Amino acid sequence: MFEVGGKCLAYHGPLLYEAKILRRWNPKLEKVEYSVPLKSGEEDGLPESMNREEFYYYIHYQGWKSSWDEWVSVDRIMELTEANIELKKQLVMEAKKASLAQQQKTKNGGSAKRGGGGAHSESNHGGRRSGSGDRRDSNAEERGIVPSEGPFRTSSVMSYNFSRNKLRIHIPMILESMLVDDWEIVTKEKKISNLPNPFPVETILDRFYKDVATRTTSPVELSLVEEYVYGLKQYFNEAIGNLLLYKLERLQYEQVFYPTPEQQQAMTPVERSLSGRRPGQLYGVLHLLRLISILPEMLSNCVGMDTQAINVILRHTEKLLLWLVDRIEDLLPHKVHKSYYTNTSSQYEGVALGL
C-alpha cells in the first residue's frame, strides 16, 4: 500500500517517472483520502469505470503540468527505491537503444519503411499504461488506450477514444525517446535550441503536405490535409510561448520575439536575422513533437469543435507521426543531434531560472 503524500515511480508509456501521490481511493474505508484538502467546488474526479474494490492512486508527475495528473491502479506504480530507480534508468537506456536501432533501420530502408512492419506494426508500446508488459487489460480499454472495437481502433501505434472526452495520442517509441533526450538535455545539461533550426516546423509541415499531395488523388482529402497543416502551424505559433517551452528556454524566446531596446542594440547579426520570423520558422522537429504530445489536451479544451473535426485532426496527426518516423534521420540525424542545442552561460541561467 502506498501512502498519501508519499513519492513513487509511475509508468507513463514505456518509461518510469517520479510522482507524488495526492489522493488515494481506499476500498476498505470506501472513501478518497487526501494529502491536501480539495478546493471549494473541486471534485475528486474518480473514474466511473474503476474497480472500487481495489486501491487507486491520484498522482502528480514531478516537473509536469498538473493537467497530466491522473488516477492509476496499483500496477502502474512502484516504490521509490534504489533498485527501481536503476530500472527507471535502464528503461531510458533501452528506449535510446531502440531509437538508434530504428533510425538505422530507417536509414537502410529496413522494417521502418511504410508498409514494412517495424514501428508501424509493433504491438502497442504504451501497454505499460495498462499495467505491466504487453498485457492489455479491460482497464486499459476503459481508459481509451486500447479500444476493443469501433471506428477509433485505427492502428497499433496510436489509438484514441471520445467516449469520455479524454483524447490520447501514443507517440512511436523512436520519437518518444527523442522527447526524453530533449527533456534531459534542456533540464539537466542546461542547453537551449540553436535558432534558426535548419529544418523548422513550417518547412517540415510543408514537406509533409507535398508528400501527401503526390500520393493523394482525392481533392477532398487533399483539402483536409492542407487545412490540417495550416491549423497545426497556427497552433504551434500560438502555443509555443505559453505551453511548449521549458523554463530555461523562455528567456531566449522573449529575447527573440520581444527584445528590449537594450537587447536589440546588443544583438549579433545572426540574432538580428531572426527578427520578424514566426516561431514555426525557427524551432525544429522536437518542438513540433512537444506540441503533438499535448495536442489531445488542447483539443479537449476546444469548445464547439465537433467529434468529426477532432477525428480528422487525430487521423492526420497519426499520418504525420508515421511520416516523421520514416524521415527522422533526415530531420534530426543522430550525428548532428547535439548541434540542435547550444550551451548557456551562467549569467543566462541565472536570469532564466531566477537564481
From Swiss-Prot:
Regions of compositional bias (Basic and acidic residues) in chain numbering: 131-144
Designated gene of the protein: EAF3
Major place of residence: nucleus
SS bonds (residue pairs): none
Pfam families: MRG (PF05712), MSL3_chromo-like (PF22732)
GO biological-process terms attached to the record: DNA repair; DNA replication-dependent chromatin assembly; negative regulation of antisense RNA transcription; nucleosome disassembly; positive regulation of transcription elongation by RNA polymerase II; regulation of DNA-templated DNA replication initiation; regulation of RNA stability; transcription elongation by RNA polymerase II
Cellular component terms (Gene Ontology): NuA4 histone acetyltransferase complex; nucleosome disassembly/reassembly complex; Rpd3S complex
Keywords, alphabetical: Chromatin regulator, DNA damage, DNA repair, Nucleus, Transcription, Transcription regulation
Compartments it resides in: Nucleus
Region annotation (Disordered) ranges: 98-150
Function: Involved in deacetylation of histones, chromatin assembly and chromosome segregation. May act as a transcriptional oscillator, directing histone deacetylases to specific chromosomal domains. Component of the NuA4 histone acetyltransferase complex which is involved in transcriptional activation of selected genes principally by acetylation of nucleosomal histone H4 and H2A. The NuA4 complex is also involved in DNA repair.
InterPro entries found in the cross-reference section: Chromo-like_dom_sf, Chromo/chromo_shadow_dom, MRG, MRG_C_sf, MRG_dom, MSL3_chromo-like
PROSITE patterns: MRG (PS51640)
Family under the similarity heading: Belongs to the MRG family.
Subunit structure: Component of the NuA4 histone acetyltransferase complex.
Domain MRG: 163-353
Protein name: Chromatin modification-related protein EAF3
